[in-house]
Amino acid sequence: MALDQRWDRFLVSWFGLDEAQLTAHRVFEGENGVPVEEYVAFVIFGERGFQGNMPSWARHLLDRPSLAQAIAVLRAGSDTVAKQAQICAAQQLLGAHVWVVVTLSRAQAADHARAIPRHVWAKYLSLPFSKACAQLCKLLALCSRFPLVTCCSKPPPSLPWLRKKWHGPLPRRPLLEVPSPTRRGVAATEDGNGLGIGAADTGLREALERVAPTVPCGNPFDAMLGSLCFLSLIKSRHVVLPACEQEGPGLVRNLGRRLLAYNVLSPCVSIPVICSRVARAALAKRARCARAVVCMECGHCLNFGRGKFHTVNFPPTNVFFSRDRKEKQFTICATTGRIYCSYCGSEHMRVYPLCDITGRGTLARVVIRAVLANNAALAIRDLDQTVSFVVPCLGTPDCEAALLKHRDVRGLLQLTSQLLEFCCGKCSS
């Protein structure tokens, strides 16, 4: 069933409107009609749903001082439309908005609130579109506004709530308990040396078993849910995050912080390749070039960048990970053999070659990555700012060394103008 037909049935069943009147004055048909798919995106994301290419009908709904004027332009291209046609068009536009709200939130309005008199629909014609949507949702006791999702186009480092730490209460998640080790099997009666346990030791052990039948194990379900959600969301093209740090339960806040860190924090900068000799040398070194191991959550490089370097100031780093051990490297678990980041504890890592190719076919280009000492590549704003970074050695095909450079950002962008800048002392001699 087409979406506009589903909306008509929704209006008839919910508000008791005349289906014949709705069919006679359709607003989602014709050359000047509103496309149903675009209208759904408009209701959810507003102007941001069109990514800068907003159609004329959406512009009329937002800019006209009243819904009646917007409908008049949509229906006839002028300011004169019959009153009944205006009311039917308003019922379709506002009713479709309510349908989207009810479908996404699974909310239900009271039966007595659905019987909307004709004069109330006529009143909505004198209001702007956004205010008419808010008034109708308020009448139906639906907690909603237009648009449903507020899109913020500001860069994440400029958001005010990213410049302060979270000092609120820690979320209290229900903890699980499992049977103690002695209740999972037969307890040993001898120690490792083959010596028996005395009567006093046996009594002490039995007393401890009685008072501690279970042991806490945290909440593995929350940990599993958070891990699965994070891995799923980083593969999505669009993700909706909480508007501020204080909203949502602890798991939601943690996911929002991890997603922002995944998309914002990075130590790598792609240097534009200017010289053809540098491009050929980088292509030849793809298999043997130096590599950077980057934690995908805190954004730190774990094999470069330790010591005293010129770093980029990045205040939001304290929001994502407040602790700083001054040591970005690997931590290997002696029990399981898993490798963790010593800074944030994550095991989600990725290896980036410092010489690589991006794109395919005619869009392929050579990329040389420069690795900063911290995770603030996004915060570089000033061309005169001095930074420390690591680049690969391109001297000989067998050399896997990396070079430490101290340059300003302008010099970093012009570094590939000559091959000599990418030769270590051994290769240049």
Curated annotation (Swiss-Prot):
It is found in: Host nucleus; Host cytoplasm. Pfam families: Herpes_UL49_1. Disulfide bonds: none annotated. Disruption phenotype: Deletion mutant shows mainly attenuated late gene expression and decreased virus production while viral DNA replication remains unaffected. GO terms for cellular component: host cell cytoplasm; host cell nucleus; viral tegument. Induction: Expressed during the early stages of lytic infection. Its main location: host cell. GO terms for biological process: viral process. It comes from the Viruses. The keyword Iron does not apply. Keywords: Host cytoplasm, Host nucleus. Participates in the expression of late viral mRNAs. Interacts with ORF34. Belongs to the herpesviridae UL49 family. This is Protein ORF66.
